[in-house]
Amino acid sequence: MKDLTHVDEKGVKMVEVGHKDVVFRKAVAKGRIRLKPETIELIKAGKTKKGNVIAAAQIAGILAVKKTPELIPLCHPIPLTGVDITFEFGDDYIEATCEVRAYYKTGVEMEALTGVSVALLTIWDMVKAVEKDENGQYPFTRIEDIRVVEKVKGEE
């Protein structure tokens, strides 16, 4: 079993990466939000009351990637070289993909996971009025399957 790198006998710590080489890093995370089919159609048609759902989710996700070390206390601030957030539509879901790139001493998986999570949360926020049932609940809406699907260390 591997040891935890952020915890030792003295408590919690930020891992020392000063000795590591600067290399290309990439992480891709995906996740889905389940929505009513009618909500998906409203988003595609650009007819939601709060505005362009996809553009807002992209901007929020990119901002979240940049803010990751402020949200997750033991993450290193990383000089990012690029972030892409894309979406694929299904009949009752939107799948978000967040790709993060950097040249640095440590990986960018947490940044990719944070970006995809906030992008999906932003979609929820922008469509919650049409997703609620008559009791103000969200019986169908859910965020699921957030995961890292690719990690690259080394050559681009």
UniProtKB/Swiss-Prot annotation:
Pathway(s) this gene product operates in, as recorded in its UniProt entry = Cofactor biosynthesis; molybdopterin biosynthesis
Q: Which UniProt keywords apply?
A: Lyase, Molybdenum cofactor biosynthesis
User: Superkingdom of the source?
Assistant: Archaea
GO MF assignments:
cyclic pyranopterin monophosphate synthase activity
Record family assignment: Belongs to the MoaC family.
Gene that encodes the chain? moaC
Q: Please name the InterPro entries in this protein's record.
A: Mo_CF_biosynth-C_arc, MoaC, MoaC_sf, MoCo_biosynth_MoaA/MoaC, Mopterin_CF_biosynth-C_dom
* Annotated organism of origin: Thermococcus kodakarensis (strain ATCC BAA-918 / JCM 12380 / KOD1)
Q: Does the keyword tRNA-binding belong to this entry? A: no
Active-site residues are: 125
Which Enzyme Commission numbers does its entry carry? Answer: 4.6.1.17
Protein name, as recorded:
Probable cyclic pyranopterin monophosphate synthase
HAMAP family per the UniProt record, alphabetical: MoaC_A (MF_01224_A)
What is the purpose of this protein? Answer: Catalyzes the conversion of (8S)-3',8-cyclo-7,8-dihydroguanosine 5'-triphosphate to cyclic pyranopterin monophosphate (cPMP).
- Record field: catalytic activity: (8S)-3',8-cyclo-7,8-dihydroguanosine 5'-triphosphate = cyclic pyranopterin phosphate + diphosphate
Any GO BP: Mo-molybdopterin cofactor biosynthetic process
Question: Subunit info?
Answer: Homohexamer; trimer of dimers.
Note the PANTHER family from the entry.
Answer: MOLYBDENUM COFACTOR BIOSYNTHESIS PROTEIN 1, MOLYBDOPTERIN COFACTOR SYNTHESIS PROTEIN A
- The residues the record assigns to binding substrate are 74-76, 110-111
Matching Pfam families: MoaC (PF01967)
